[in-house]
């Protein structure tokens, strides 16, 4: 099996662990390469779309995993080894490495995680695994949002910002903003206003077969943030269109119960 190891850049403990993992994989007959992930600035794709690896092992936290999915020209199976603070996306702890590697000769069950395809005024600008965030450039300023679902006006409100999350991202920023935890097998858009002016503006869960468009009606400077990694300036009257991406992220299913894992992770926050 050809395996790409992606580790968090500049962390000596992570780098040492990645070399130990590489030696273990070689011992089991796998071919490996290591990519040191720099979380800052632009970077080339992790690999050629014509010759992708069979598996990507990410050593780090959720941020490293999110950036890895963005920098893959095609989606291949991912497994995360948690070297972050919480690691909702990482199913394996460092001490479980040997057991996982010993099972790589067996068929690996996959879990497809829905992603959001994003366009601004009709132009594709990115894909989100966790969430897309719309906020002002200046603190303590509100934006005015007009929401269309399948071309019909659904809501108009003012808020400090708006989170549009996948079920995977429901345990991230959306949860901190008061959104519900959503089973990742449920495919939908979770729309969570940030500090809305009216208390009646509550989170919505929208079926992924629908198309959602968000128009900024205010004149305040704003930006779109994708998975906490990419920032894009938004002009007044910009329309952000969201739809289900045809290319989901693929994760190795390590056999953990989702709700048990969430309960365990939240206890450590």
UniProtKB/Swiss-Prot annotation:
For this UniProt entry, the molecular function terms from Gene Ontology, in alphabetical order, are:
ATP binding; metal ion binding; NAD+ kinase activity
Q: Which Pfam families match?
A: NAD_kinase, NAD_kinase_C
Catalytic center residues: 62
Q: Which GO terms describe its biological process?
A: NAD metabolic process; NADP biosynthetic process
As cofactor, the record names:
a divalent metal cation
The keyword Iron-sulfur is annotated on this UniProt entry: no
Say if the entry is tagged with keyword NAD. yes
Record key words, sorted: ATP-binding, Cytoplasm, Kinase, NAD, NADP, Nucleotide-binding, Transferase
Q: Binding residues for NAD(+), per the UniProt record? A: 62-63, 130-131, 141, 158, 160, 171-176, 195, 229
Cite the EC number: 2.7.1.23
Catalytic reaction equation(s): NAD(+) + ATP = ADP + NADP(+) + H(+)
- Top-level lineage group: Archaea
GO CC terms of this entry? cytoplasm
Question: Which cell locations does it reside in?
Answer: Cytoplasm
Q: What does this protein do?
A: Involved in the regulation of the intracellular balance of NAD and NADP, and is a key enzyme in the biosynthesis of NADP. Catalyzes specifically the phosphorylation on 2'-hydroxyl of the adenosine moiety of NAD to yield NADP.
PANTHER family hit by this protein: BIFUNCTIONAL NADP PHOSPHATASE_NAD KINASE, NAD KINASE
Family the UniProt entry places it in: Belongs to the NAD kinase family.
Q: What is this protein called?
A: NAD kinase
Q: Which organism is it from?
A: Methanospirillum hungatei JF-1 (strain ATCC 27890 / DSM 864 / NBRC 100397 / JF-1)
């Amino acid at each position: 099996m050809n395996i790409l190891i992606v580790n968090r850049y500049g962390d000596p403990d992570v780098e040492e662990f990645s070399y130990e993992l590489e030696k273990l994989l070689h011992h089991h007959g796998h071919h490996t390469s290591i990519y040191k992930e720099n979380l800052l600035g632009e970077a080339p794709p992790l690999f050629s779309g014509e010759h992708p690896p069979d598996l990507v092992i990410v050593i780090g936290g959720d941020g490293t995993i999110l950036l890895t999915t963005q920098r893959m020209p095609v989606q291949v199976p991912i497994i995360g080894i948690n070297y972050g603070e919480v690691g909702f996306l990482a199913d394996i702890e460092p001490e479980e490495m040997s057991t996982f590697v010993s099972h790589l000769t067996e068929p690996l069950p996959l879990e497809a995680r829905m992603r959001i395809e994003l366009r601004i005024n009709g132009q594709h600008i990115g894909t989100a695994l966790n969430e897309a965030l719309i906020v002002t450039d200046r603190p303590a300023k509100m934006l005015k949002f007009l929401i269309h679902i399948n071309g019909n006006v659904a809501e108009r409100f003012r808020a400090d910002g708006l989170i549009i999350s996948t079920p995977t991202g429901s345990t991230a920023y959306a949860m901190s903003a008061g959104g519900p935890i959503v089973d990742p097998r449920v495919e939908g858009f979770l729309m969570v206003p940030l500090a809305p002016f009216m208390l009646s503006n509550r989170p919505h869960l929208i079926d992924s077969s629908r198309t959602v468009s968000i128009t900024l009606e205010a004149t305040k400077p704003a930006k779109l943030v994708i998975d906490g990694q990419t920032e894009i300036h938004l002009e007044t009257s910009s329309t952000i269109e969201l739809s289900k991406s045809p290319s989901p992220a693929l994760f190795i299913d390590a056999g953990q119960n989702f709700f048990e894992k969430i309960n365990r992770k939240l206890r450590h926050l």
